Structure formats: structure tokens, C-alpha cells
Swiss-Prot record:
Lineage summary: Bacteria, Pseudomonadati, Pseudomonadota, Gammaproteobacteria, Vibrionales
Site feature location: Part of a proton relay during catalysis: 44, 107
Protein name (record): 4-hydroxy-tetrahydrodipicolinate synthase
Keyword set includes Nucleotide-binding: no
Residues given in the record as pyruvate binding sites: 45, 203
Record-level Gene Ontology MF annotations: 4-hydroxy-tetrahydrodipicolinate synthase activity
Biological process, per Gene Ontology: diaminopimelate biosynthetic process; lysine biosynthetic process via diaminopimelate
Broad enzyme group: lyase
Disulfide bonds, paired cysteine numbers: none
Broad class of where this protein is predominantly found: cytoplasm
Function: Catalyzes the condensation of (S)-aspartate-beta-semialdehyde [(S)-ASA] and pyruvate to 4-hydroxy-tetrahydrodipicolinate (HTPA).
Protein location: Cytoplasm
Length: 293
């Protein structure tokens, strides 16, 4: 259902801080042409935390419109209030989204039982396939494999995006949840190793600007051609790392603008544009990846 290179899409903004839908359409077309396996609209990289509900819904619906059935679209629907996460998921009922990506509740630090009940409530409210999203570095809570296993027993909880970077969890989760439960890396730097160990793909920041390379790399991995995939991975490794020289999505939006993929690199406060001191680092990573001369 979900595999390969799925992009965690940036949300392009104009200089007034409004969504730039012309650039969004160009990005969707770029990913279709590059062979990207799916698009996550309005996730962390899409600045979900600083979008209004109206903007959030419109962004997902416009992404679906621009995709026009040519590529699966996954809606970011996470919230730290369960009723809000349920509402978001229900808003996309019959919309055509392939799934919902729901981050663990952040800031309020629920227990493992609280996390289970949170996702159970979402699961019971909608038939849309749900992807759990564990990123403790941002949320201050860790969705443990044992809790994932409980959730995997629910009908429409089908996948996990694991952004811990802990490769030992792949085998643990596979053992607890079975091989049919989809595991997606949320960490570009370790994603290929994640797949080697039994994962199914990646929800990627790097793919925003190196979509064809990422799609090719994970297609090779799916064929067991890991040596060929690793050649691409090593070339992209500076990008994997340096796109986090400042908080995501600051560097990747700057890089997308530098490559002419979006009209502006604007980002909403409290995030600010990439600092002058960090720009040479990202520029060099683009050159190392072969994206700039």
C-alpha cells in the first residue's frame, strides 16, 4: 500500500506568507515525473503547525486536485488534542486521500495507554488507512513498539513512520506486528539501512529536491540491488544530513528555492529563513549531490 520514496512535501509560500498554489502545482508535477511513490501533504515539512484549519484542508484538497489520481496523496492529520485529530481525519472522508499520517500528540506527553487510546479513537472514527508517526525528538513522547503492536491489531492502522533513527526497532516492530505491517523510515540518513532490515520505504525530506534519485534508490532496494542503491545514497548523504543544519523545513525550503523549484523560500514564524552562515553548507550539499554545478 505504502512503499518506496514518499515525499514529505514542503508548503510553498509567497512573500506575504500565503500559500503559493502555482508553486505547489509545479511541485506535484515534478514528483509525478520523477517517479516519487507518494506525497504527504501538510506534514511536519509542510509546516502543519503554523497553518490554519482552513489552509490545512485546502492544501490537501488542492494537492489531490493537482495530483489528479496520478500519485497517492497522504494527508497530515496529527494534533495533540484527540478530538482535533479525529476531526481532521473525518474531514478527508471520501476525499480520495490514500491515507492519513498522524503524529503522536506533542507537548502534553501522554502515557503509552494515552497514545493507544488516542489512535484507537481516530481508527474508530474513519475508514481511511492510518499511518502512525513517531518522532520523539519533536514531540517529547516515544511511541514504543509494544504500543505499535497493540495498534496494529486495529483494522485501519496499517503503517508506522519511524523517525527515531533507531534501526534496532525495525526487527522488533516486524516481530511484534508481522511482516505485513508497513514500516516507513522518517530519517533520510538511515532510510536505506532501514529498508535493508525489512522496512518498506521512507517518508523523505531529501526527496523534495532529489526526487528522481530517491525514487531510483528505493526502487533498486526493492529489487535487492543494495550495492547500486548505496552508490546513490552516499552521493546524497550530505543532503540527508545538511538539510537538518537548522530546523526542518528551513534548509529544504531554501534549497528548493535555490534550485528554482519554488518561487520564494519564505517560511512562517516562529521559523525563520535559513541563516546566512548556514547557506554555504546547504549549497555545498547540493553540489555534492550533483544538483548544482
Amino acid at each position: 500500500m505504502f512503499s518506496g520514496s514518499i515525499v514529505a512535501l514542503v508548503t510553498p509560500l509567497d512573500t506575504d506568507g500565503e500559500v503559493d498554489y502555482n508553486s505547489l502545482k509545479s511541485l506535484v508535477d515534478y514528483h509525478i515525473k520523477a517517479g516519487t511513490n507518494g506525497i504527504v501533504a501538510v506534514g511536519t515539512t509542510g509546516e502543519s503547525a503554523t497553518l490554519s484549519v482552513e489552509e490545512h484542508v485546502k492544501l490537501v484538497m488542492k494537492t489531490l486536485e493537482f495530483a489528479d489520481g496520478r500519485i497517492p496523496v497522504i494527508a497530515g492529520t496529527g494534533a495533540n488534542a484527540t478530538h482535533e485529530a479525529v476531526t481532521f481525519s473525518k474531514l478527508f472522508h471520501d476525499s480520495g486521500v490514500a491515507g492519513c499520517l498522524s503524529v503522536t500528540p506533542y507537548y502534553n506527553k501522554p502515557t503509552q495507554e494515552g497514545l493507544f487510546q488516542h489512535y484507537k479513537a481516530i481508527s474508530e472514527a474513519t475508514d481511511i488507512p492510518q499511518i502512525l508517526y513517531n518522532v520523539p525528538g519533536r514531540t517529547a513522547v516515544d511511541l514504543l513498539p509494544e504500543t505499535v503492536a497493540r495498534l496494529a491489531e486495529l483494522d485501519n492502522i496499517v503503517a508506522l513512520k519511524d523517525a527515531t533513527g533507531d534501526l534496532e526497532r525495525v526487527a522488533i516492530t516486524r516481530e511484534l506486528c508481522g511482516e505485513n505491517f508497513i514500516q516507513l523510515s522518517g530519517d533520510d540518513a538511515t532510510a536505506l539501512d532501514f529498508v535493508k532490515l525489512g522496512g518498506h520505504g521512507v517518508i523523505s525530506v531529501t526527496s523534495n529536491i532529489a526526487a528522481k534519485d530517491m525514487a531510483t534508490m528505493f526502487a533498486l532496494a526493492a529489487q535487492g540491488k543494495f550495492e547500486e542503491a548505496e552508490i546513490i545514497n552516499q552521493r546524497l548523504m550530505p543532503l540527508h544530513n545538511d538539510l537538518f543544519v537548522e530546523a526542518n523545513p528551513i534548509p529544504v525550503k531554501w534549497a528548493a528555492h535555490r534550485l528554482g523549484m519554488i518561487t520564494h523560500s519564505d517560511i512562517r514564524l516562529p521559523l525563520t529563513e535559513l541563516s546566512l552562515s548556514a547557506q554555504p553548507t546547504v549549497e555545498q550539499a547540493l553540489k555534492s549531490a550533483g544538483l548544482l554545478k
